[in-house]
Amino acid sequence: MISPTVFIIEDDVDTREMLAKFLELEGYQVEIAGNGLQALDRLTDGVEASVILLDLMMPVMDGWEFRRRQEKDARLRKIPTIVVSAAGRERMAQISADAYLSKPVDMDELLTRVSQFCAV
């Protein structure tokens, strides 16, 4: 049985690695991108994702622009997206997403949210 894949879109290397290692230990496959443009390129090239963890403040293409483009793509808009950001709740609420997590990330809450969208 193939494990669900979590696609982490995060520019901070330490945060990205911490999230990836934690999720891999919990049985998930992980894909990573350092900004929204890298993620869009990989997803449109056929990389599959069960759920996306999306930072908002990134260089090249931020999370807001990624979500605008994701919503325009019939396949990508179906992928549940969890915003994971240091932006305040009000700022995060300005973007449509399936769930929101504040940084620093509570790993138990992260696991709960991810598992809501894909079971291991």
Regions found by a protein language model. Name each.
Residues 84-85:
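Hydrophobic/aromatic residues positioned on beta-strands within the core alpha/beta folds
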Residues 58:
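Receiver (REC) domain active-site loop signature in two-component systems and cognate sites
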Residues 32-51:
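Acidic, metal-coordinating helix/loop segments flanking the phosphotransfer/catalytic sites
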Residues 17-25:
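Charged docking surfaces used in two-component/phosphorelay signaling
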Residues 105-118:
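C-terminal output helix
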Residues 10:
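Conserved acidic carboxylate
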Residues 55:
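Active-site residues of response regulator receiver
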